[in-house]
Amino acid sequence: EVFAEQPHDRAHLFGGAIGSVARYLSEEEGPALLPEPDRAACARLLGEAVVRVYPLVAGSGVPLPQVKLRNMRSQWGNCHYQQGYITLNTALARCPEPLRDYVALHELVHFLHHDHGSGFYAAMDARMPDWRARRQKLKGYARAIVE
């Protein structure tokens, strides 16, 4: 199964409990966030991001991982390559699609390169040439992460 159900602070991508992820930001505070999605929409938006970018790594032997959702305080996602899953921050659902895709690909590339060395960045460059611009835009959404 691609998406796995987890304890209360995580959610099955197509159902389950996902907590509130972010507060409203005014234009003075940063870029406008998308409206807070309901639980099902959050799961759908983040699941679709993984599905969209997975073909970029599939040819390199990366298995389609389990995807866990979690309300995280300091990061947009992480990869547990030895256990075969990635975790995406539920707050990412309030960011534009290109930024969701960037984070999903970033985590998938960690199945190829476990650290942020030159090989990792070369793999990102080959698969998403504008990833640096997306990363820079994502920094403007940092307040979406729940304190």
Regions found by a protein language model. Give the residues of each.
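Active-site-proximal or metal-binding-adjacent scaffold patches in catalytic folds
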Residues: 1-102, 111-147
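Walker B catalytic acidic pair
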Residues: 107
